[in-house]
């Protein structure tokens, strides 16, 4: 059996990079966790740690996938952190499942492509095409800077104009 041990320092650094690149460093520190989830790439738990730190979870199921999936998941979950800070107790999901209009608008504002799914609300399967070339450069820099190839099975697709993360999973 192969054991995949997440490097929390790398995940923390990647969250910081997403925060800096897309949110001008305005998001608070979070606690990053890795657990198994069959139907989600990650999830957000507001004020889960000592009542003052949010938790972002990344599903262990995807550590054998493309590093891009982790970066987009961190970006997606960071939008939840942003929305919680802006709206307070007002959630951007309904019944902890469906992403609502507040989430959709924040995705548009922070460069994630959004599609609507009747069962799960708004989902972010890829970046906006206008940003994909920029993101591809940033992505390549992150892969090299943090040596992500040793954590993930690198396939490094051409991201421009392609349907990214079309695995049917949700965030």
Language-model segments: residues:
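Surface-exposed beta-strand edges and their flanking turn/coil or helix-capping segments
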Residues: 45-47, 70-73
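Active-site recognition of the HExxH zinc-binding catalytic motif
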Residues: 72-85
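A broadly used, surface-exposed interaction patch
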Residues: 58-72
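Active-site-adjacent structural patch at catalytic or cofactor/ligand-binding sites
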Residues: 56-60, 77-79
């Amino acid at each position: 059996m192969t054991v995949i041990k997440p490097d929390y320092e790398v995940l923390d650094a990647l969250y910081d990079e997403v925060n800096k690149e897309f949110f001008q460093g305005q998001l608070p520190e979070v606690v990053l966790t890795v657990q198994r989830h069959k139907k989600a790439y990650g999830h957000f738990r507001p004020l889960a740690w000592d009542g003052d730190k949010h938790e972002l979870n990344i599903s262990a199921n995807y550590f054998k996938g493309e590093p891009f999936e982790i970066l987009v998941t961190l970006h997606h979950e960071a939008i939840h952190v942003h929305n919680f800070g802006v709206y307070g107790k007002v959630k951007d999901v309904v019944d902890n499942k469906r992403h609502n209009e507040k989430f959709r608008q924040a995705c548009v504002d922070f460069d994630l492509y959004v599609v609507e799914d009747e069962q799960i609300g708004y989902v972010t399967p890829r970046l906006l095409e206008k940003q994909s070339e920029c993101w591809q450069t940033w992505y390549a820099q992150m892969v090299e800077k943090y040596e992500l190839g040793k954590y993930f099975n690198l396939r490094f697709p051409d991201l421009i104009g392609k349907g990214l993360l079309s695995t049917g999973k949700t965030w």
